Design a protein with these regions (language model features):
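C-terminal, flexible cofactor-proximal segment of oxidoreductases
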Residues: 2-113
């Protein structure tokens, strides 16, 4: 499964992307502290939804047909080939929007305890 915060810095400004992730994690930790939570884990449903979105975005690119480093190519015993992205390709603004939606939604998609 693709990670909830996949590293997309291979296709954007590393500093900007790193700052976005650091801000988001910091905000989540502050939210957890205010709510007296000490544990956060993405739900299986959220992981599947995010993975599907990452793969769907990637499938719409020409990169999906390559055998480059950003693609995990698996050759199945039945002769089929499966290509999965190793990075997020949806773009910085969309990534920020998705992160903000999760935060503003009270970290919906995460189990907090």
């Amino acid at each position: 499964l693709a990670s909830w915060l996949d590293n997309g810095s291979a296709f954007c400004n590393v500093g900007v992307f790193g700052a976005l992730q650091a801000e988001w994690v910091t905000q989540m930790l502050c939210y957890m502290k205010a709510g007296n939570y000490s544990y956060a884990q993405p739900t299986q449903a959220a992981e599947k939804q995010w993975t599907h979105a990452v793969y769907a975005d990637f499938a719409r690119t020409l990169m999906a047909d390559t055998n480059a480093w950003w693609v995990k190519v698996t050759h199945k015993p039945d002769g089929t080939t499966v290509r999965r992205t190793l990075v997020y390709v949806g773009g910085g603004p969309e990534y920020r929007k998705r992160c903000e939606e999760v935060a503003y939604g009270g970290y919906e998609g995460f189990e907090l305890a």
